[in-house]
């Protein structure tokens, strides 16, 4: 009966979450029936609810992205652009153009950047490697960061692309803070 009821909910186009809530209530009711002795066991305990779909990732609007990419240098004279500004611009361009995850950008090594070919070799989730092409704008921002910004941030040798003001690899939280600053 319980499976038929779940099939009815599916045919009636109820959301999976709603069907799972109904199933949870039925299971609770049967557990109570077992406790008070009305039934010997719960037939609902072995039934699994419908699988929940994964939500789509949030996507930033194009107007917000344009504002984000122009925020780093906004209102600054060329001589006032700092190493941090160059890093942040390269970081934002790279995240946008290459579709990197924050964790991938945080762990990106210089040996994984191939400027001549405009490619990145990225270690993604589950240690899966992928090759990512770079847009011209991201290449230009990275080249400027490698030439002017990164050397000013280095306090010693580091294999990481994106460095903090102390010369350490940028953490994922520090990268998220760049987004927050840029979005105001």
Tell me what each language-model feature is.
Residues 1-184:
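Conserved catalytic core of the tyrosine transesterase superfamily
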């Amino acid at each position: 009966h319980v499976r038929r009821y779940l099939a009815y909910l599916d045919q009636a186009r109820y959301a999976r979450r709603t069907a799972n809530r109904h199933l949870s209530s039925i299971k609770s009711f049967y557990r109570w029936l077992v406790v008070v002795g009305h039934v010997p066991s719960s037939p609902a305990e072995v039934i699994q609810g419908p699988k929940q779909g994964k939500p789509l990732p949030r996507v930033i609007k194009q107007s917000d992205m344009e504002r984000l990419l122009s925020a780093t240098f906004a209102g600054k004279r060329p001589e006032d652009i700092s190493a941090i500004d160059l890093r942040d611009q390269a970081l934002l361009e790279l995240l946008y153009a290459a579709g990197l995850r924050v964790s991938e950008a945080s762990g990106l090594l210089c040996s994984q950047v191939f400027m001549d070919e405009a490619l990145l070799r990225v270690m993604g989730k589950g240690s899966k490697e992928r090759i990512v092409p770079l847009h011209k704008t991201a290449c230009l921002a990275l080249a400027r960061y490698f030439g002017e910004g990164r050397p000013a941030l280095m306090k010693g040798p580091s294999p990481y692309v994106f460095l903090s003001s102390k010369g350490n690899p940028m953490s994922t939280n520090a990268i998220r803070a760049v987004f927050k600053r840029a979005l105001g």
